[in-house]
Amino acid sequence: MSNGKIYLVGFGPGAQEHMSYRARAAIAEADVVIGYSTYIKLVQELLDGKQVIKKGMTEELDRCTEAYEHARHGRIVALISSGDIGVYGMAGPTYEVLLASGWRPGTGIEVEVIPGATALSACAALVGAPLTHDFCSISLSDLLTPWPVIARRLEAAAYADFVVALYNPKSGRRTGQIVEAQRILLQHRSPDTPVAVVKSAYRRKQSIQLTRLAQMADCEIGMLTTVLIGNSNTFVQDGLMITPRGYANKYQVTGEVKDGEQAGRSLSLGLHGWKVNVRERLSQGQTPDEIARHFDLPVIEIESVMNEEPAHV
């Protein structure tokens, strides 16, 4: 019997026009299509003549096992997921099931991961450009992750001034997690920090709410919602949520380079310039603790500069 194949397909936010050509081709080639029932509905028009296996919530490992069994019998399987199947999706669990069953890459069943536009990208596109600078995503689902781990990640992201995308913010049974997330974020962020609450991006019941961090938990939020929380520079203007890339740190609005900066070179407070600045402050009698407070950094970062030999450039 010939070996089968498993396509792990991310088909994007749901609208057909946002599905990649490769995702369509993989579904078309498949003998069997497996997915959460809601995902099956979103691609129903592509499934004529195929064996379709619908699964419910909490049956993720069953989907992986079924995909493996069908592929073992020589069939081509498309295990589908909305968004990107490698981002909070089925790619990881599938590989775990395969490896636990003795499968190894290059032997037997072929596996191909097909990426798709994930929820944070889709939601960001609908509200402007909130992800133009450093960002992170955190799932508030504690079904598989202990809350202390989630809280620690929220704390770190808030302190580091990341734009934060919250996945799985709330469900019928999980209503307190978004409130706790808001509390943690408010320890480091202004109550006026812009927030976008996007439900069912690019689907029939799409809704968008622009609000502030202080009101975030009061918004209509559910399992199909992604929440985007700005950093200290994010702003909303004319209905657009925008996070500056940082050009204002180096350039005037005229396009001219600011005094002390050079086009195409690190900022004056880039890594080298920052270390020079730290050494200057130390030579002026400032203590490591004072310098750490000035830059809002752990004192160990200042001590690391003190322990280095100055670079000669």
For each predicted feature, which ranges?
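Class I S-adenosyl-L-methionine
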Residues: 1-111, 217, 256-268, 272, ...
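A contiguous loop/helix-start segment that scaffolds small-molecule binding in enzyme catalytic cores
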Residues: 6, 159-269
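Short beta-strand segments
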Residues: 10, 79-82, 114, 138-141, ...
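Gly/Ser/Thr-rich loops at beta-strand to alpha-helix junctions
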Residues: 15, 83-88, 117-119, 171-174, ...
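Class I SAM-dependent methyltransferase SAM-binding "motif I" and its flanking Rossmann-like core
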Residues: 15, 21, 90-163
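Short, amphipathic alpha-helical "recognition" segments used to contact nucleic acids or chromatin
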Residues: 270-286, 300
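Short alpha-helical "recognition helix" segments of helix-turn-helix
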Residues: 290-293
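DNA major-groove recognition helix of helix-turn-helix
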Residues: 295, 306
